[in-house]
């Protein structure tokens, strides 16, 4: 089943659309030490990658926490069941179908994203869309957590240096997500010149396409927030940045 687009879809409609489907049984999230050079950055960031030569570059990871672990922080069990178990799984399944027999078979996920991105294209290819969304969601799950720990000093200092204050960064990050027209993502990235920047991208486009390192990403497709926040995207973004982000995971990507 194709992932839901940016249309307003009620929780009842989503349940009907996915009726009969059950959450997949997945292998545990694994980090693999034998990687090609282009994969090193993603591996050090803690993002699952697939070694070159492995046919199936798309594998759905388990969540790094229970489905109900984020509910007290504003992201319900139902949202994670739909978002991870069905939407993300659809990107994995569709991506594997499109990858089979293509010139990109055997490449790493990161290599596929970069190779299939077409700058300036009105619509990206099906393989790119599914590969990039798979990569995006791998990062999304990893930068959230129920721990609620304080922001590490190294990250705080870097944000103050780049934005003037942590509060200004949070303001810019939420504004980028709220200002993204239609489906997309907002990001905290380290640019090629080393500077920290807030960016936004449409649909499944991600920082890999521009040679940037993603430190934090937030999904602003409607399926990511409609169950819990209905059409209130700004409230979802405020809740994400203030309650859901695992700042230690973000710091590890620096």
Question: Predicted segment positions?
Answer:
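Bacterial carbohydrate/catabolite-sensing allosteric modules
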Residues: 1, 28-30, 223
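Charged/polar low-complexity intrinsically disordered segments
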Residues: 14-16, 25-26, 39-41
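Extreme N-terminal basic, low-complexity initiation segments
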Residues: 2-13
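Cationic, amphipathic, low-complexity segments that mediate targeting or membrane/lipid association
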Residues: 21-27, 31
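Cationic, low-complexity basic patches in intrinsically disordered or flexible, solvent-exposed regions
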Residues: 3, 16, 32
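Intrinsically disordered Ser/Thr phosphorylation hotspots
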Residues: 10, 22-23, 50
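Short, Lys/Arg-enriched N-terminal segments with co-localized hydrophobic residues
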Residues: 34-55
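Feature for soluble, non-membrane regions of globular proteins
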Residues: 51-254
């Amino acid at each position: 089943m194709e992932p839901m687009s940016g249309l307003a879809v009620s929780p009842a409609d989503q349940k009907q659309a996915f009726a009969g489907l059950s959450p997949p049984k997945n292998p545990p999230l694994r980090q693999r030490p034998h990687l090609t050079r282009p994969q090193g950055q993603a591996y050090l960031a803690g993002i699952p990658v697939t070694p070159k030569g492995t046919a199936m570059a798309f594998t759905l990871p388990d969540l790094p926490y229970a489905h109900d672990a984020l509910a007290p922080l504003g992201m319900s069990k139902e949202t994670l069941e739909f978002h991870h178990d069905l939407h993300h799984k659809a990107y994995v399944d569709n991506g594997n179908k499109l990858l089979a027999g293509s010139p990109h078979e055997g490449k790493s996920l990161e290599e596929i994203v970069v190779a299939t991105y077409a700058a300036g294209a009105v619509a990206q290819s099906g393989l790119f869309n599914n590969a990039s969304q798979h990569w995006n969601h791998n990062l999304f799950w990893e930068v959230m957590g129920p721990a609620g720990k304080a922001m590490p000093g190294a990250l705080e200092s870097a944000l103050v240096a780049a934005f003037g204050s942590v509060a200004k960064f949070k303001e810019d990050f939420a504004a980028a997500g709220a200002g993204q027209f239609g489906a997309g993502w907002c990001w905290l990235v380290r640019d090629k010149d080393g500077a920290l920047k807030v960016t936004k991208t449409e649909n499944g486009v991600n920082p890999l396409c521009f040679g940037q390192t993603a430190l934090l990403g937030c999904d602003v497709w409607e399926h990511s927030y409609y169950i819990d926040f209905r059409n209130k995207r700004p409230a979802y973004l405020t809740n994400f940045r203030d309650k859901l982000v695992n700042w230690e995971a973000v710091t590890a990507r620096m």
